[in-house]
Design a protein with these regions (language model features):
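Extended glycan-interaction surfaces of carbohydrate-active proteins
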Residues: 1, 20-57, 99-124, 167-275, ...
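Substrate-binding cleft of carbohydrate-active enzyme catalytic domains
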Residues: 1-166, 207
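An alpha-helical repeat/solenoid feature that recognizes helix-turn-helix modules
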Residues: 7-11, 16, 62, 125-131, ...
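Short helix/loop capping segments that flank catalytic or ligand/cofactor-binding pockets
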Residues: 25, 85, 214-216, 394-397
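Amphipathic alpha-helical scaffolding segments
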Residues: 88-92, 222-225, 300-304
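Repeat-solenoid scaffold signature
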Residues: 145-193, 201, 206, 210, ...
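Non-catalytic C-terminal accessory modules of carbohydrate-active enzymes
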Residues: 246-251, 268, 272-273, 279-399
C-alpha cells in the first residue's frame, strides 16, 4: 500500500507527537484532496501520489478517526489556521459518516462498517462507536472555539445521547460486545466475543486530551476482561490458521476471544492473531486506569518476542516490515509521565504514574521540546523542573 491507510493510522501517535506539522499534511490530504463532494473519504490516499482515487467503500473507523485526529493536531499545535482551513470539509465528512453508518438515526452506528481488519462489521459495536464518540466530542469543542455555537449545541446533544445509548446497548457487565441478532448472518463478525480493540476510540480520545467517551468504571472493567480473557501466557493452545506473529511458548494479546461461547462459524479472520500495535494501545489505556502491572506484562511480552534473536527489535511486523500500527507505542512515554498538552489554551502538565520520587522524561508539543524532572523528598515536597531544549513555551502555563 501507500503507507497512509487511515484506520491503521488511528493507532499511530509517534508522528503526531514528534512531527505535528508533518501529521497535519496528512489531514490536509485526506480532507482537502481525497474527500469527494459527498464527504466520502477513501481509506488510502492516492491522488496526492499522482494515481487515480481509490474506488472502494470508505472505512468507518478511518473516516471518523481522521476527524478525531483533526482535534488532536489542533490541540498539539494550537494552529487555528489549520482548523479553519479544514473545517468545511471536515463537517462534510462528519455529516456523510453519520448518515452512512447510523442507519436508523438513533445516534448509534449500526450500518455496514468497513474496518481495519479488512472486513465489514454489521450492527452496533464499540470499536467504531468509541471513535465516533471521540470525533463528535472533539467537534463540539472545535465549534465552540470558532464561535459556531449552533453546531456545538447540535453535536453536544448527539454526543450525550449516543454515549449513554452505546453503553446501555453494548456493556454486558464485563466488557463491550457487538449487537447482532444472528452472529452468523454475516461472515467475519464477533458478536458476544471480547474484542481487544473494543476501546480503541477511548485510547484515541485520551491521546488527544478528550477524556472519557464511556463511563470510567466500565472502561476499567472492560480492560480487566480484555486482560483476563485475551492475554495468553503461552500461544501453544491458540489455534491460528492466519499469520503467525506469536507462537509456541511466547505470550501475547490475541485480537478476540469468546469466553461466554458464541464464536461465529466464520469469525473475522485475524481474531487469533497478535498485533503489537493493538497490544500497545491497550497497555496505554490500562496505564490510564492504574493497571500498571498488566500493562507492563503485555509490553514485556512484545519485547520478549522482538528480542533481537527471534525477530528484529526495530521492525514489528504486521502486513509487512516496519508497519505503522506499532507506533502506538509512543503513547507510553506521555502516559507514564502523566503528560498532557493543550496549545490552544497554552497549558501543559505532568503527573508521573511510576517512579514519582525521582522521574525524568522527554516532552514535546507544537511549541517546543525538552525534559521534565520531578523529585519528592521525605517530607513530601515536590520539585518540578521543565527544561526547554528547542522552541519557546514562555506563554505556556506549566501545571
Amino acid at each position: 500500500g501507500q503507507g497512509n491507510v487511515n484506520n491503521v493510522w488511528n493507532y499511530a501517535t509517534a508522528v503526531a507527537n514528534l512531527f505535528p506539522e508533518l501529521e497535519i499534511t496528512m489531514r490536509n490530504v485526506e480532507f482537502n484532496v481525497e474527500l469527494d463532494d459527498d464527504g466520502c473519504m477513501p481509506f488510502r490516499a492516492r491522488k496526492c501520489l499522482g494515481e487515480s482515487r481509490l474506488d472502494m467503500i470508505p472505512a468507518c473507523d478511518g473516516e471518523f478517526g481522521s476527524i478525531l485526529r483533526i482535534y488532536r493536531e489542533w490541540k498539539y499545535t494550537g494552529d487555528d489556521e489549520f482548523l479553519k482551513g479544514i473545517w468545511d470539509n471536515m463537517m462534510k465528512a462528519l455529516e456523510f459518516s453519520i448518515k452512512e453508518w447510523d442507519t436508523d438515526g438513533d445516534g448509534v452506528l449500526d450500518g455496514k462498517m468497513h474496518v481495519t481488519y479488512d472486513i465489514e462489521f454489521y450492527g452496533p459495536n464499540t470499536m467504531t462507536n468509541t471513535i465516533y464518540l471521540g470525533a463528535i466530542k472533539g467537534v463540539v469543542e472545535m465549534a465552540e472555539h470558532l464561535g459556531k455555537q449552533d453546531i456545538a449545541d447540535k453535536y453536544r446533544a448527539l454526543y450525550e445521547k449516543a454515549s449513554v445509548l452505546v453503553d446501555e446497548k453494548l456493556f454486558n457487565g464485563e466488557y463491550y460486545i457487538q449487537e447482532l441478532e444472528d452472529v452468523d448472518a454475516y461472515r467475519y463478525q464477533y458478536g458476544i466475543g471480547c474484542l481487544t480493540d473494543q476501546l480503541l476510540g477511548q485510547f484515541m480520545a485520551q491521546a488527544a486530551g478528550l477524556g472519557y467517551v464511556l463511563p470510567k468504571e466500565h472502561v476499567k472493567k472492560a480492560l480487566q476482561s480484555i486482560y483476563k480473557y485475551n492475554f495468553k501466557e503461552c500461544m501453544d493452545d491458540v489455534p491460528n490458521v492466519q499469520r503467525t506473529y506469536a507462537l509456541n511458548d511466547e505470550a501475547g494479546l490475541v485480537l478476540c476471544s469468546w469466553p461466554k461461547g458464541g464464536r461465529p462459524r466464520f469469525p473475522f479472520a485475524y481474531c487469533d492473531e497478535v498485533w503489537t500495535g493493538v497490544e500497545y494501545q491497550v497497555a496505554v489505556t490500562m496505564i490510564k486506569e492504574g493497571m500498571i502491572e498488566e500493562a507492563f506484562t503485555i509490553i514485556k511480552a512484545i519485547r520478549d518476542r522482538y528480542d533481537g534473536y527471534k525477530r528484529c527489535p526495530w521492525s514489528e511486523t504486521e502486513a509487512g516490515h516496519h508497519y505503522i500500527r506499532p507506533m502506538s507505542s509512543y503513547s507510553l512515554i506521555p502516559t507514564l509521565a502523566g503528560y498532557s498538552c493543550d496549545m490552544v489554551n497554552k497549558t501543559m502538565s505532568f503527573a508521573p504514574v511510576i517512579n514519582e520520587k525521582d522521574y525524568t522524561t522527554f516532552w514535546i508539543n507544537g511549541k517546543g521540546w525538552g525534559t521534565y524532572h520531578q523529585t519528592i523528598d521525605d517530607k513530601g515536597e515536590v520539585k518540578k523542573e521543565v527544561t526547554v531544549l528547542y522552541g519557546n513555551i514562555d506563554d505556556v502555563k506549566v501545571e
